[in-house]
Regions:
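Conserved N-terminal beta-strand and adjoining loop/helix that marks the start
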Residues: 7-33
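Charged phosphate-binding loop/patch that engages nucleotide di/tri-phosphates or the phosphate backbone
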Residues: 144-170
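A short coil-to-beta-strand element that immediately follows conserved catalytic motifs
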Residues: 75-84, 152
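Unchanged
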Residues: 55-78, 88-142, 164-170
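A conserved beta-turn-beta hairpin within the catalytic core of GNAT-like acetyltransferases
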Residues: 42-46, 97
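Short, solvent-exposed loop/turn elements at beta->coil junctions and helix N-caps
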Residues: 11, 83-90
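Short Pro/Gly-enriched beta-strand edge/turn motifs at strand-loop
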Residues: 2-9, 83
Length: 170
């Protein structure tokens, strides 16, 4: 049976997801490299987050994670560990799905970009920063994730007061 685009049943009415990647570079001392969003950014200005962004058309998830890491930090990863994926139900179509990675065996020279400034932190230090809201929960999950473990599944939604609701499972 032919599985062309028309056979997929894809229409504007169907719920769709925008793919993104989020990468947490971790050095040999166990410190994580975070990015403080530039003050002129539309979203997450002056908040700390992992490097990441949208996939380009035709780009694989892994290629997108490697590209975003290099563009935003100047680093390449010898080892990219898939920690999980999270669907974000924004209440409108499309939603978001982001794929979360831990980057290890790093090479290159750390350099800030137009996205913001970079700095290394221990996990306890990082959790005291002004982080993007979900990182207080997400960062510990990523930091304790091991390469041989199953990735986690996450679902984010917003309640009637526009407050973030997070659920995770394995």
């Amino acid at each position: 049976m032919i599985m062309g685009v028309q056979a997929q049943g894809i229409t504007q009415e169907r719920y769709s997801l925008i793919p993104r990647v989020l990468v947490f570079p971790v050095d040999e001392k166990g410190q994580v490299l975070l990015l403080k969003g530039a003050s002129n950014k539309k979203i997450w200005a002056n908040l700390w987050n992992g490097p990441g962004g949208h996939l380009e058309a035709g780009e694989s998830i892994v290629a997108g994670a490697k590209r975003e890491l290099l563009e935003e930090t100047g680093l390449s990863a010898g080892k990219l560990i898939h920690c999980g994926q999270i669907v974000v139900d924004t209440g409108i179509n499309p939603g978001i799905i982001f794929f979360v990675f831990k980057a290890k065996e790093l090479s290159g020279v750390v350099r800030s970009s137009v996205e913001g400034e970079l700095s290394w932190f221990s996990q306890p230090q990082a959790l005291k920063l002004k982080l993007v809201e979900d990182l207080y929960t997400l960062l510990p999950l990523v930091m304790r994730h091991r390469a041989n473990e199953k990735p986690f599944w996450g679902h984010y939604s917003y309640d009637e007061n526009d407050q973030l609701v997070m659920r995770f499972s394995r």
